[in-house]
Swiss-Prot record:
The lineage of its organism: Bacteria, Pseudomonadati, Pseudomonadota, Betaproteobacteria, Burkholderiales. It is found in: Cytoplasm. One of its GO terms (cellular component) is cytoplasm. Catalyzes the NADPH-dependent reduction of L-glutamate 5-phosphate into L-glutamate 5-semialdehyde and phosphate. The product spontaneously undergoes cyclization to form 1-pyrroline-5-carboxylate. It comes from the Bacteria. This is Gamma-glutamyl phosphate reductase. Keywords: Amino-acid biosynthesis, Cytoplasm, NADP, Oxidoreductase, Proline biosynthesis. One of its GO terms (molecular function) is glutamate-5-semialdehyde dehydrogenase activity. It is an enzyme of class 1 (oxidoreductase). The keyword Flavoprotein does not apply.
Amino acid sequence: MDIDQYMTDLGRRARQASRAMARASTAAKNAALAAVAEAIERDAASLKEANARDVAKAREKGHDAAFIDRLTLSDKALKTMVEGLRQVAALADPIGEISNLKYRPSGIQVGQMRVPLGVIGIIYESRPNVTIDAAALCLKSGNATILRGGSEALECNTALAKLIGEGLEAAGLPQDAVQVVATSDRAAVGKLITMTEYVDVIVPRGGKSLIERLMNEARVPMIKHLDGICHVYVDDRADLTKALTVCDNAKTHRYGTCNTMETLLVARGIAAEVLPPLGKLYRDKQVELRVDAAARAVLADAGVGPLGDATEEDWRTEYLAPVLAIKVVDDLDAAIEHINEYSSQHTDAIVTEDHDRAMRFLREVDSASVMVNASTRFADGFEFGLGAEIGISNDKLHARGPVGLEGLTSLKYVVLGHGEGRQ
């Protein structure tokens, strides 16, 4: 296969389809989503057969249990796919919405209209559910998409692509609006991220090595985040019960997510009160603690151990594991300084009963999501009321934070006149 020619052809067809999608009615888009949901329910058995072949090959290659779990398309996963499609169909359609319409002294009206981005390339690892999630959001937001999933999920993704195509056709929409890259050749990724004439944005969903490669090689703009080094700062005016709840959930709810707390900062004035119960809680849940000297003194005195020594590297590490770095800081100033130095600008939280300090934390911490008295685990499109998300961005341009339907759109200016000319 000539990868260059193959990817160019996908891009050309996606660009053409994007024009039809931009003018597609809400009813047609929702009909397509409903048809895909029905097709998945109808063909669940064949989808599971395709997935079983992918899983068997992955086992032969020696992939670990966690990888196999992400790859496996269970009955629950299929049900979630179907529910997700119907939830996206129920979301308000942002396309064509005009906002901020104002009369100018010249007599014209100036406003902004929400429009699709165009063609979105999604690069992700071996999670079949992402194929449906990404296709649904791109479809509803009036975009065309090129999906490049992990090679280990190729058979299942191909089967899903067929059902998506059938759903689009049934609704009178172009099948090329959702295309799956049907090759495991890594050169396809290299071509996709440089096709600026056909692809408007890339959304990568994967590990750090994938994101770093794309950051180095991509010519197409990206919506992405590299790390999730999230902090919780427990202020010396924190409510102890709230602090325990937030810090427990932020770390132990799920270890392998980008919005999990990786560093806990505690004000010196409350360390002796909050660290012992937290330390015992983490110890009971088998969380490895890497602490600075001040935290060690408090925890050791309370009989909490074993304790590792936190290094400079720990403040910069996204563990994605039951490991937590803990540092005692003098005050809010020191906490903000530490966070802005080491945070990946993803999600950071403060626990405090002091309104002024909370507002200052919100203003001065330079992250995509900043929280007061709430777990960092809430940094999620569904929890934010977006209905669904295609990913999370910690960049400052275009979308920032969880990226839902609006994050896959842009604004253009519209002018309504009555024959005016500029004086």
